[in-house]
Design a protein with these regions (language model features):
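Short S/T/G/P-rich N-terminal loop/turn motif that feeds into the first structured element of a domain
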Residues: 1-49, 56-70, 77-99
Length: 99
């Protein structure tokens, strides 16, 4: 599995605006191949928010980013205080012994 972390700053006092976009974010993510889960994260005081998403593969995450990144940019264009920061990580899962 693979994960993507995108952090963006919109400034304080925008929590309700971001909260209003969460359902749209969710629908967009769920429509992408290889989607597993997304968390929308944020700190109201600093005005920093982001998404942490999990994908079946790095290729799925990168393909989804081609769709999601422009949508995010457009949805937040009047709010963004600088470009979003993006990272990708391999997901490391512990081996489980179910016995």
């Amino acid at each position: 599995m693979y994960s993507r972390l995108v952090i963006f700053k919109v400034g304080s006092g925008k929590h309700s605006t971001i909260e209003g976009l969460v359902d749209e974010f969710d629908d967009l993510y769920r429509a992408q191949k290889g989607f597993r889960h997304v968390f929308i994260i944020g700190d109201e005081a600093s005005g920093e928010y982001g998404s942490f998403s999990v994908w079946e593969s790095k290729e799925d995450a990168e393909a989804a980013n081609v769709v999601i990144a422009p949508w995010l940019q457009q949805a937040l264009t009047s709010l963004l205080q600088g470009p979003p920061e993006r990272w990708g990580f391999e997901v490391l899962e512990p081996e489980r012994n179910d016995t």
